């Protein structure tokens, strides 16, 4: 029994050695490829040059298809599975960067602010009495323009929605500056009867808010600021005109010519600023 086991073991050892010796090694493969690559140029019996596999002209002029030997390799690459949660190194580093966190938080805050301002503006404009109360409280085209730009920037609107927003804004600007058509006549014709009637119909709290807005405009104008400064403070041109009307400037045009001309200049500068 031991003798049979010994002979069987010798048989397996011999078989393994034969298989090992018959398999080409990496070194022999490299030597063979080097030997074949050195013979890149041969001549046939007719004196014509024969191109071998390593010749660059053959690779350019020969067939460009995939050989049958390479097909299984490409199929194996196609079937190879990659990790589902593989994250690029730069992407992971970018996500862990505190600066990017701060930028993302700042963007979210600006987005929330833009949405709140747009919501608040819609509520103001949706008043059943129209735009009158909003204008009396200091609503200006510059404020509407800022809200419009923020809404477009921080919201995902399509081209049609953006065009509609722009049209609504242009309509508001046209309606707003139509109130100054009589200002440029000689003598100026300013009609505040509709707004004055609207103020009388307001509640006590609403009238207090309108008076506060008018007093704020008076203090700013009396400070003697330039047009650029007044625009940066977003002083309402309509409330400025209403202030001069309340002070009786249009009742005596010759006496208040400088104040009226200053208002005309400010309206012109304001319109130019928002239409740039």
Swiss-Prot record:
Subcellular localization is given as: Secreted; Host cell membrane
Record's GO cellular component, any one? host cell plasma membrane
Principal localization reads: secreted
Keyword Signal in the entry? The reply is yes
Q: Where are the transmembrane segments?
A: none
**The keyword Signal appears for this protein:** yes
Keywords, sorted A to Z: Host cell membrane, Host membrane, Membrane, Secreted, Signal, Virulence
Report motif location: RxLR. 110-113
Q: Where is the signal peptide?
A: 1-27
Q: Which family does this protein fall into? A: Belongs to the RxLR effector family.
Q: Reproduce the free-text note on domains from the UniProt record.
A: Has the canonical translocation RxLR motif, but lacks the canonical EER motif, which characterizes most oomycete effectors identified so far.
- Tell me the function of this protein: Secreted effector that partially suppresses the host cell death induced by cell death-inducing proteins.
Q: What is this protein called?
A: Secreted RxLR effector protein 85
Naturally occurring in which organism (per UniProt): Plasmopara viticola (Downy mildew of grapevine)
């Amino acid at each position: 029994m031991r003798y049979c086991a010994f002979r069987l073991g010798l048989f397996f050892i011999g078989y393994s050695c034969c298989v090992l010796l018959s398999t080409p090694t990496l070194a022999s493969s490299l030597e063979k490829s080097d030997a074949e690559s050195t013979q890149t140029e041969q001549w046939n019996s007719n004196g014509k040059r024969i191109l071998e596999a390593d010749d660059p002209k053959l690779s350019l002029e020969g067939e460009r298809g995939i050989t049958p030997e390479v097909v299984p390799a490409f199929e194996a690459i196609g079937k190879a599975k990659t990790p589902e949660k593989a994250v690029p190194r730069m992407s992971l580093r970018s996500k862990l960067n505190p600066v990017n966190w701060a930028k993302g938080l700042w963007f979210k805050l600006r987005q929330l602010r833009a949405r709140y301002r747009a919501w608040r503006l819609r509520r103001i404009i949706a008043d059943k009495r129209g735009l009158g109360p909003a204008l009396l409280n200091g609503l200006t085209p510059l404020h509407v323009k800022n809200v419009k730009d923020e809404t477009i920037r921080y919201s995902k609107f399509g081209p049609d929605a953006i065009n509609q927003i722009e049209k609504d804004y242009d309509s508001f600007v046209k309606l707003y500056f139509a109130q100054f058509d009589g200002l440029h006549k000689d003598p100026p014709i300013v009609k505040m009867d509709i707004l004055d009637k609207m103020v009388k119909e307001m509640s006590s709290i609403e009238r207090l808010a309108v008076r506060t807005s008018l007093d704020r405009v008076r203090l700013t104008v009396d400070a003697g600021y330039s047009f650029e400064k007044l625009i940066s403070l977003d002083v309402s041109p309509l409330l400025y005109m209403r202030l001069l009307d309340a002070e009786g400037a249009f009742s005596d045009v010759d006496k208040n010519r400088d104040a009226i001309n200053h208002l005309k200049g400010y309206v012109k500068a304001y319109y130019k600023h928002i239409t740039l």
